[in-house]
């Protein structure tokens, strides 16, 4: 868990450009990682690979050598881990308690008159593993990196038992030196694991992180960090510039200021997300002509099939009844309604909520529209709706409300659009928008964090002037780490 925390905290950084994402990890968040921290240590310490120990036997009437092999950890109890903030730009952690048991084999050859070979076992027990580490978060190549500012390590007590051997007097010649070297090796390997290996892994991961990440169908998430985060006595906070765009396009929309208020309730973390990010996504998607959909006879399981028919009975309601020219020239056909954005859609986040505005062109074609290029008519539709965001199943999701549609005629080759038909078409458009929005919001945006640590489903989402703030605790999804 300390590994997860170091990666998570390292991703907190600051950009000199006005930020679009801000992350704050509070004392409560540090306590979460502290409480769970022993799990990753148990996993890492068990993987320690002890080197072979060799040394000469210099006492007694002869000479010889001793080799210690197959040293391995047979039992490990993690020390207690406590993380702390280290102003102005870092984080520290310390450990106390815990124990480790190590077993291995020794082989000795002692030459008096003739070589004498003997062997046995070694058992060691180390108690109270104490580590103090402070790391500073820096920036390298637009990516965060960890640097060790201060570090100390000690094992308070190490007891070694040397057993076996057919000639005790030979064993007594090297027992003190063997015990000393095993003690040093245990201290050394624990120190490397608890201090160096974890940080090297964190920096390796951080250095390998791409800053241009494809998230779906040529849509890319970009981010960059340029300055260190801010660490105080109660939280560590960093900012980054981020956007989501199509292909290799750029986004030059204005970025609005995000305040630093978090309210009075205590959470483990707070996340600020600027409306710049979804609006950049909409801008690039509109520029690439990707924001379009077709309502045809098969849309939403054929719900609008009868209305889109050019021919219908006297008691039925269809588009052919409103426009006889369709029934005359295209009998028993269907009309496709192709919707596409006429201007860049806009998402507005206010304290009162989130609203979306779309200006759509609606072109009418004989179905299928891909085979009939003549536009029968064009309408303009102004669509607005509100979004109520939520976190469901570890994804940022939501529902839409207050959908309004206003349609006006732009041009037509099939006759004038009267208000009765416009009203029917507005209802159809509203239903289509709801179907598409509900489908997209149901999928949502998955919110993974670091190594099975994610946000709680009861996270609070607050809309402010130009941004959303997510106030959340962390939860850990248990997996087997053996």
Residue ranges of model-derived segments:
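Classical eukaryotic N-terminal signal peptides for Sec-dependent ER targeting/secretion
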Residues: 1-10
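Eukaryotic helix-linker segments that join adjacent hydrophobic helices
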Residues: 60-70, 74-107, 112-114, 119-152
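Extended, low-charge, aliphatic-rich alpha-helical segments
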Residues: 3-4, 15-101, 156-482
